[in-house]
């Protein structure tokens, strides 16, 4: 039974689509994010350990965020993003989700 469960999870993971997320930080995000940063990073680590998050971070100018995620659909990813403390506290002010086809 355990083998079937592992196989099922692997199959579901392989069925997940990849998405690119591009968004914008609030003004003075570097300062405003500080009280929430530890909670944010801890959550992201858990999501990454679950193979949902591939990568996420700010652009060098720190005005924008860029990420790659595995998810079943855009609604699932939207829910995931909007449960993040950065979204709840207004550190992330908007975002767009794009289905992505990884060529290699």
Language model features with spans:
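Short, Lys/Arg-enriched N-terminal segments with co-localized hydrophobic residues
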Residues: 3-15
